[in-house]
Amino acid sequence: MSIPPGAPQPSYILRGHATPIHVAKFIRGNTRLITGDAEGWVVLWSLETRRGVAVWRAHGGVLLGVGEWGERGEGIVTHGKDNKLIIWKLPPSEEDSMSKILPVDTVSEERRKPWILHILDVNTMNFCAFAMCPIVTEVNPAEHEERGKDDEAQLGMEWEGESEEQLLIAVPNILTSESIDIFHIPTLHRIHNIPSPGPDKPGMIMSLSLFFHPITKCLTVISGYEDGSVSVFALSSPSTRTPSSPEQWNTIYQSKSHIQPILSLSVDPGRDRKFFITSGADDRIIKYLIPATTTPFSPSKSTSKSTTISSTKYEPKILKSAHAGQQGIEIRNDGKIAVTAGWDGRARVYEVTKMRELAVLKWHKEGCFAVAVADVLDRDRDEDKDGRSSVDGKGRELVGGIGYLDVKGKRLRKARETHWVAVGGKDGKHPISINITQLNRPPISESIHRTLGNIESQVPQLGEFQPAIVDAPADARECGEIPLDFVLREAGFQTVGSVGAGD
């Protein structure tokens, strides 16, 4: 396939799924990429070697969502169309015992699955993926037993004692797809139900987000609906609750700015949680402000006929991209760019502040359904006091000496520090591929272009790059020598707009 000069080109093509890829996410400090397909298969890829390190069939239907749980990244959450949400335990130390046979390769024996920690029966009628929010509470085991199941379901925010990892899961209600259920892990109890936001039925819930607001300190839920509207709910503040007025969910914001169903939403990953962005079946990418309040909103009309919002102060910013059907929107953790997967087979990169398109990633011939954006990591934060790097469940690397990295260490550091974007979909051919593009490679100078003809003699020294390991001949992979065409593919990448390493 010809690619326009200067356009972002794939750095790696990972092939292994036999059906369209519906979910993708970078985990463990960018050292792993997890993908899931239409038949329920999950593949955990190593970004260091670009190979699958764990393969299993998590669900009997299409994957709707994946997530990472736990301080050490040992928990993997999968949500399938088979009405199951499963939390698996797969620490890095157990990856060697997992199957490496990819879904496209059929085998007679069943592949080993990770240990199952929890299974939750959920509603998947509307294809809405779960939302999750980790919490850390202090639990006294003796008091835990005395309080019983009812109080246990209230999370015990005032308990004191031993620390315990817990999780909140938000999914559409089992009976009515316009309301939201929130479950507590590990008790599996439903602790909250949020009803439909108003008398006008907005249709099915299409996308969810769940978090604790940093200013109000209250649990907050954002939902996108089939009619193109969004609602923001906040649990009433503990300081305002009385015996006669128990906790309740207030709708603090509403807006209807999409003219087609909302397909995805992503919340500001920064500490302040100031905004969120949505994409839909229409051509609009919309940015909304999140009110820092728990007070119910007062409806008012905006200047736009298609928009009803809580106040003109929070009127959304609308970008008409002229490209309908963008889903899987994800904001990078530095809050500077957002990426979408398009039905037209294109992934698009947007600048969040100015809400403008920066780049179009073109590779797939048919629709793209999933996108993942690697975190921008702070190297200084991940190094210990003596200047050495370490490795843990999040993927930090172990270096043999101060200031020294061997070949493996360089590959691991590159995997962690590169600004990757992974795009998955259906190519119209087998096997299905995941397109991983690098956003921070510097432009190639003219002098380098003039000397590329002499680079072949230096190829054996460039084995650490392995720019196309999946496509490289087996003998080249084994000896570390990469043929010239693969080196050219790696060297030919251009920077994308203003999203370089200094952004």
Curated annotation (Swiss-Prot):
Keywords assigned by UniProt, alphabetized: Chromatin regulator, Nucleus, Repeat, WD repeat
Record bears the keyword NAD: no
Signal peptide location: none
Spans of repeat WD: 16-55, 58-98, 200-243, 257-298, 321-360
UniProt key word Repeat: yes
Localization, UniProt: Nucleus
Any one biological process term the GO annotation gives: chromatin organization
GO cellular component: nucleus
Record function comment: Component of the ASTRA complex involved in chromatin remodeling.
Family: Belongs to the WD repeat ASA1 family.
Oligomeric and partner information: Component of the ASTRA chromatin remodeling machinery complex.
This protein's name: ASTRA-associated protein 1
Originating species: Sclerotinia sclerotiorum (strain ATCC 18683 / 1980 / Ss-1) (White mold)
Lineage, top ranks: Eukaryota, Fungi, Dikarya, Ascomycota, Pezizomycotina
